[in-house]
């Protein structure tokens, strides 16, 4: 089975870094949204990145930064506070390439 997502877009908000507890200790995590432009529309894709790539994104990127991300699609089903069935979709990022010009 293949589950691979490749996107190029712009980060929609300044990044905030969090730390989560794991069996390996605390690891950095950054949630962000990527604006991906198509011909007529813009899609806003939720993404999450961990470990060193989260550190690097937090240090060097900001709202508007253009990036290439590669990862897997995660779909979670849950029941909200109103007892409605909901679905949450996000990209678990495994690779990030910064696409902005270094002089920007």
UniProtKB/Swiss-Prot annotation:
One of its GO terms (biological process) is DNA replication. InterPro entries: NA-bd_OB-fold, Primosome_PriB/ssb, ssDNA-bd. PROSITE patterns: SSB. Keywords: DNA-binding, Plasmid. GO terms for molecular function: single-stranded DNA binding. One of its GO terms (cellular component) is nucleoid. SUPFAM superfamilies: Nucleic acid-binding proteins. The keyword DNA-binding applies. Signal peptide: none annotated. Residues 1-100 form the SSB domain. Homotetramer. HAMAP family: SSB. PANTHER family: SINGLE-STRANDED DNA-BINDING PROTEIN. This is Single-stranded DNA-binding protein. The lineage of its organism: Bacteria, Bacillati, Mycoplasmatota, Mollicutes, Acholeplasmatales. The gene is ssb.
